[in-house]
Amino acid sequence: MKKSIIIFGTAFLIMALSTAKLSAQANYKTGVGIRGGGYENGLTIKHFTNSSTAIEGILGFRPGVIIVTGLYEKHAVAFSERSLNWYYGAGAHIGSIDGGRYYRGYGKDRFYDNDELLIGFDGILGLEWKIPEIPIALSFDLHPRLECARGPYLGIEPAASLRFTF
């Protein structure tokens, strides 16, 4: 757990220092697609409110779990390449886990007899590539989240997203 936090913190610091003087240029206004690889797989929508700020919604699923996440994100050009953007942000999630589910987690194994509410805070740090000349964006990110209602529990979810942009 500590190793993941150190890796996330180091990546965030490198990203912040390398993009401090660069401004992002959104290559699309809205993107809709799929996300997978972490705790939940599901749907994602990202909408830019200006050239460097976006809001993202994620509807995630896994067996017995549904979760909705909202994120506020800042974007900045990565590696002086206009089609690549670093992004980071924060938000929150709410969801539910069905009763009768067994959860294995870092030595804190649990069985949920009843339906349970999930509420917590989220962060995100990633890299997005808007493929030039076609309406597709690919992103890879780390999505740390703090579960408050059933926790406290801190997890870091790596994931990839594929969005159709317009």
Predicted regions and their residues:
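Bacterial N-terminal signal peptides that target proteins for export
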Residues: 1-9
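Outer-membrane beta-barrel domain signature
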Residues: 25, 30-32, 57-59, 110-116, ...
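Short glycine-rich beta-strand segments
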Residues: 35-39, 89-99, 143-147, 165
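Predominantly the C-terminal beta-signal and adjacent terminal strand-loop region
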Residues: 132-166
